[in-house]
Amino acid sequence: MPSTMQYRQLGKTGLKVSALSFGAWVTFGKQIGDPVARKLLHTAYDAGINFFDNAESYADGKAEVVMGAILKKSGWRRGSYLVSSKVFFGGEGDRPNEDGLSRKHMVEACHDALRRLQVDYLDLYYCHRPDPTVPIEESCRAMHDLIVQGKVLYWGTSEWSAAQIEAAHAVCDRLHLHHPVVEQPEYNLFHRARVEKEYAPLYRSPGLGTTIWSPLASGLLTGKYNKAVPKGARLDTPGMEWLRDAILKKPGIEKKVAAVAKLAAIAKSLGTSLPRLGIAWCLRNPNISTVILGASKVEQLTENLGALDVIEKLTPQVMRDLDAISGPLAD
């Protein structure tokens, strides 16, 4: 585990976020039991992580319930950590108006998240996907009102295009509303174009922050899927068949598996592990505010926290070598 956590500014906001953060997707309320979840959250906090990521749809709301119970009993000062939720896919119900980005669902989902997480406000609240069925003015105003009411401090988006983010800013400018300040996109050695190219103008103005997910390509960059999906792995989790097929049945997967072996060789030459290398590579991008880690075991989380010590080993030549291997296969 690294001796000192690094902290970065979230875009152009005044919020400081740990370079590594911890997310509840897949694991909390589903893949692991509550005692393990508690150990993971405490391990993360003790290592200096101050941002815990969640969403209404994670285990249909159960992930927030588990996290909320741990936070409530932790004794941690509320000012010492950040917690998020996301709205779009729905959580506990599946009736009309229980998903999407309508004003009604966004407000109800916020109230539900506050109840499940047992907090008085959300530090970050994301529109989990764009909703083409709802006027963007409605969604922007709903976020603005939640901020004015003190239920949300900052709002952002997840997997929105640059054009959609710019459209939201234009609406907020015109209506004098609080702007989105952060985007949560997928980012790893094999998935790079949106973060590195499409969003590039947004880092300068309006000053977009990023809280990236899937730094290890849902496990592909650990090397554990080179032969088959091991028992207990994320892609072996019930309900994750869609993700397993999206990764392992995608055209060109054989070339990526071969590339992973080459990346592992570079990691070995640097005296580190492939997961640490993959995470450190993400952190080398100055436009990344934080890398969200997921883990089902304390040992796994501790291992990945060591990525902070690998950053200094990623010299310009090493970065070129990594790019030569992964770049041609990245989307």
Outline where the language-model segments fall.
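N-terminal small/glycine-rich loop or linker at the start of catalytic domains
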Residues: 12-28, 84-97, 121, 126
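N-terminal binding-site loop/beta-alpha segment at the start of enzyme catalytic domains
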Residues: 1-81, 331
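Active-site mouth loops of central-metabolism enzymes
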Residues: 24-35, 92-107, 128, 132-133
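Acidic (Asp/Glu)-rich catalytic clusters
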Residues: 11-14, 70-79, 115-118, 147, ...
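Short, acidic/polar
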Residues: 32-44, 100-117, 165-170
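Conserved beta-strand positions
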Residues: 22, 54, 85, 124-127, ...
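Active-site groove signature of glycoside hydrolases
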Residues: 114-134
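Beta/alpha (TIM)-barrel catalytic core signal, keyed to glycine-rich beta->alpha loops juxtaposed to Asp/Glu
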Residues: 132, 136-329
